[in-house]
Swiss-Prot record:
Mg(2+) binds at residues 137, 197. Residues 80-298 are annotated as: Endonuclease V. GO terms for biological process: DNA repair; methylation. The record marks 170 as: Interaction with target DNA. This is Bifunctional methyltransferase/endonuclease. GO terms for molecular function: deoxyribonuclease V activity; metal ion binding; methyltransferase activity; RNA endonuclease activity, producing 5'-phosphomonoesters; single-stranded RNA binding. PANTHER family: ENDONUCLEASE V. It catalyses: Endonucleolytic cleavage at apurinic or apyrimidinic sites to products with a 5'-phosphate. Its EC number is 2.1.1.-, 3.1.21.7.
Amino acid sequence: MQSIDLYSYLYSLLGQIPEGMVTTYGDLAVALGDVKAARACGYMLSRNNDTENIPCYKVIMSDGSLGGYSLGIDEKIRRLRNDGIEINNGRIDLKRYRFNNFDSSYPLKRLQEEQEKIAGLAVYSDDYNEDKICAIDVSYKDEIGYSVMVSFENNEYDFKTFIKETRFPYIPGYLAYREFPYIKELGKNFDGTMIIDANGLLHPRRCGLATYVGVIMNKPSIGVAKSLLTGSIKNGYVYYNNMPLGYMINSRTIVSPGNRISLESSINFIRNLGKDHYPEILKIAHDRTVALRRNNII
């Protein structure tokens, strides 16, 4: 498992922008390794508290418009003009001022490679415990994650919580690198089937959070997502690249196997829990994370 402080890595890239030049959120995302990270780049820049040493003002939109800045647009304009950059009608000429030749190790590409390797290790034959289950969810306030594991055995619920800072923002396709540290801590001593509020096999690289968790922790796992992020529906099954990777029980309950369970068994498992509705144990986990985030107590 790779662990990356993506905030610090992004901020280090800004130091490469020459004086009198700017870059775009998309250029930074490409330097990280995936253009899908452009929105996350904007978020991470908005969280920068060291505005004197980390020049976030040098990042603009792909159409040359200025975008936002934590110290306000007037201060952004002042700093850009102090660097000798011309601004006309609220835009900068990217042909003249654009820098995108970053020296980068492309960390997100490395994570993609890791996901592909982990996907190859996932097992989709049945080897799971249906009598001992847990659900895990994480809720966030800024960079702090509030996580809860709800386990159910012998008709009794048990709860564990874990609070930790994250240095990896939400980027579609990379949820494992944001949430796995919480799941690892909460579930390290659990020996049943894990139900994860995310996808498993249903993922562009067949390695959603539930698969990542299941393989790394060597546990049976099932992903249950509340929205369809990829694929198309045919007779309830979710197809991606012409392969059935998941199943939509309803518009808010999309199931895919994570590890050590088949697609059909995953569907039956979740249906038995929720009677064609979103599983109650996941609802409890979600409500508890929200309460933990709001109050820091349960």
